[in-house]
Amino acid sequence: MNRHVIIVAGGKGLRMGGDIPKQFLPVGGKPVLMRTIEAFYAFDSSMHIILVLPVSQQAYWKDLCETYHFALRHDIADGGETRFHSVKNGLAYVKGEGLVGVHDGVRPFVSREVIAGCYEAAQTKQAVIPVIDVVETVRHLTKPGSETVPRNDYKLVQTPQVFEVQLLKEAYQQEYTDAFTDDASVVEAMGREVCLVQGNRENIKLTTPFDLKIAEVLI
């Protein structure tokens, strides 16, 4: 079965507090985005990798690839106005049947086991997302104040989120709404169920300077 992955890297990295978008920042001497691509290539060297980048960042990425002698094969799609539109642009590069994952470009520490688990489960479940347990106490904000909620009723969602190709393409024909916070929410809007599989806690989304410090430890 053909495997594809759309790696979305359209963030400006404003919470990092610097001028360089977070997906290009070095971790362990190599840009984050290269490590993310390598994680999927290590799982399946024949996987079709589609990188979604804003047009304004594509020349910079190509320069980085030359500087770091990064030659892993991948297509580049144009980033859109929102994540939804970026994924939709990436889907245009996916041909035929098979499975397609969507992964955050700034999650370089996804494990081989999680990638394998998502794609394997999607062969029968068609829509799969990795999750991890909530370990902190969770409070729900209300008009009077806040209240504790049972944390066992909640999960933290990660990527890659993996789907049967035609299912995800059909889902992305829907009109965009701001309720679409990830790919699972787009598929669920059609009334389809999403299967949960175990993620890995190291699969953090690098968003803040503190996250980069954690990343250096994880290398």
Curated annotation (Swiss-Prot):
The record marks R151, K205 as: Positions MEP for the nucleophilic attack. The keyword Transferase applies. One of its GO terms (biological process) is isopentenyl diphosphate biosynthetic process, methylerythritol 4-phosphate pathway. The record marks R15, K22 as: Transition state stabilizer. CDD domains: CDP-ME_synthetase. SUPFAM superfamilies: Nucleotide-diphospho-sugar transferases. The keyword Transferase applies. InterPro entries: IspD, IspD/TarI, IspD/TarI_cytidylyltransf_bact, Nucleotide-diphossugar_trans. Its EC number is 2.7.7.60. Pathway: Isoprenoid biosynthesis; isopentenyl diphosphate biosynthesis via DXP pathway; isopentenyl diphosphate from 1-deoxy-D-xylulose 5-phosphate: step 2/6. One of its GO terms (molecular function) is 2-C-methyl-D-erythritol 4-phosphate cytidylyltransferase activity. Catalyzes the formation of 4-diphosphocytidyl-2-C-methyl-D-erythritol from CTP and 2-C-methyl-D-erythritol 4-phosphate (MEP). Belongs to the IspD/TarI cytidylyltransferase family. IspD subfamily. This is 2-C-methyl-D-erythritol 4-phosphate cytidylyltransferase. It comes from Phocaeicola vulgatus (strain ATCC 8482 / DSM 1447 / JCM 5826 / CCUG 4940 / NBRC 14291 / NCTC 11154) (Bacteroides vulgatus).
